[in-house]
Amino acid sequence: MPIGRGTVRRGSAALILAAPLLGTAPGAAGSGPVTFATPGYELRVATDRLTLTTVRAGRTVLATAAGAFRFRIGGDWYLVREVTDSSREGDTVRVTAATDLPDVTVYLRITLRSDRYDVNWSLSGATADVLSTAYDLDSAGHWYGHGENTDQTVQPWPLDSGQLVDTAFSPASYQVVSPFWYTADGTGLRVDTDEPMDVRINSGGNGLGEFTVAGDRPAASTVFVEDTPAEVYRDHIALVGKPEHSDTSYAQYATPLWNSWAQLYGEQNQRNVLAWARALAAAGLDGHAIQVEESVIAADFDERFPDLPALSQELKRLGFDLGMWTGLYMPETAADFSQAVDKGYLLKDPSDPSRPCLFTWWNGRPTGLIDLANPAARQWYTRGLKAQVRESGVAGFKFDTAFFDDRCVPYPGATRADYVRHGTELAGEFDQQRAGLRVAWNAAQAQGFATRTADKPTTFAELRAAVSANLAVSTIGYPFVETDMIGGSLQYPPPTDEVLARWAQAASLMPLMYASTSPTGVRDTTTGKWVDYDPGTVELYRAAIATHKRLAPYIWDQVRQTLKTGDPIMRPLFFDFPKDEAGYTVADEWMLGPAVLAAPKLDEGTTRDVFLPSGVWRDVSRGSVLRGPATLRAYAAPLGVTPAFVNLRAKGAAKALKALRAAGATR
């Protein structure tokens, strides 16, 4: 069924690779198309100006825009124009088209398959700097996928309801991304590249999806043609790989990981960490680990943490393992910086390979990045981590940020994708305490790491963005997902009681809980003043942890199912209920496995509308049985209520219902 589009938020963005197309996206392709049929769909190639239109059951389900195929040479953009020849031999379609340049021709090869087609196009007569393809967003209904937005505070869901501009979309991105997009009409796009791209979704409200790649090789992509978004997702996973295992244990799924960042920010020291951990334990706020957001490479680390073994022992007595932050970034102030430079262990400067590549890190300090593709550097770095485990009682690590930076050059013979592989292999040697990785791209899905979405500020708007980011990351192939961190961070004022409680409640109905701000109190980093939370907030947070812990057997079942199928655990409603049109724009509900519909309150107030898809549902808060599809208007959700519903006909319903009743999604 055709799915309508949501409201567009307008904005502007700088240009790096791609220049926006003029005007807005048109409708169908031009007149006189050449049609190539398969049993499942038709591909129509317009001849007056090269465009591709995918038709299933007589209806357009994806189309490129007019002027969709473009290329840039130097500072000038040129369009691909009329088709001059086309032919089909077996499953291969070949198309030749003219361009704005009289001596330059485009060759396009399409390989037709039963549920997809591969597109490969390039120039003859010139070498382009970049090749760009644009799709009409409206032709396929709503768009999803991509992963995280570069603006961490905004995550449009669906993508076309807002704007995304990522001029450095690559394996080295800080954001968790993959070159995969899917649509409400059951089509999808996968761009086959490991090089940086320029990606724009609805830039300036133009209604286009623009995908630009380097022009020194053909632009290669796959278009999936299925009946539902979930089937497209499974096609994608079949190519990049489903998780081979879960790096996270059952106990780590069951209780939160507490990270010290948003609690202490720049005041990371042994005394403060212990005081925080003791307050958590005294308040009955469970967790499996206390993770210190600091690295032993800091120049003053020994002053601030004089006795790591003693810290580890005391945390163990309180019920927590000790974890430490680590990353490949090495600022000039690091104790081992000079050694890393002298040994050639850092990525190299593109303008002078004899020098390390230095750039400004988040804290304003010049820094380099350890070169994991250099075997000697990798061995040196790994040896240091093993020493921490052996000598200091560190149980695991948080591997933070990226494993490569596009401002640097790869090790000779290595690609950007190799750094993803080296990074995941390195992290796999150590217990991450389910802090997960922020690394992605094709084939990283198979590693089975927990995945943290990006830091968010501390307001309700960012809680909603965190939920949408989880859905985006989960449905590009990273099912073991969590928000970073409950209550937000980014050195903003602490969250209000209401935001902190609601965030914990939402996280209780996700695969994993990742915490920092303590409901027992926190220092406001913007004022230096201590903030005491209401005792009721402690109780609500404790209840959220209890809910998640009781759901752990059900969640663990979903983990094992995901290892078989690759399906996401936290997923949008339309994955399970593709015929319910309303579900395609719901951004504040999700399915946790097949049986649990989570509808927590994600903004101020005490009521919310809840959409229930088709089926028979048990309202956990009220005990009533409801039939969908239905919209529950002004559903009562005071601060002590986390709306949740169990699909009584779904696998796992009995186990989920028992857990939610016992823990009390109403507490």
Whereabouts are the PLM-identified features?
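Beta-strand-rich N-terminal accessory domains
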Residues: 30-66, 101-104, 112-118, 605
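Accessory, solvent-exposed terminal regions and/or long lumenal/extracellular loops of proteins
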Residues: 641, 648-667
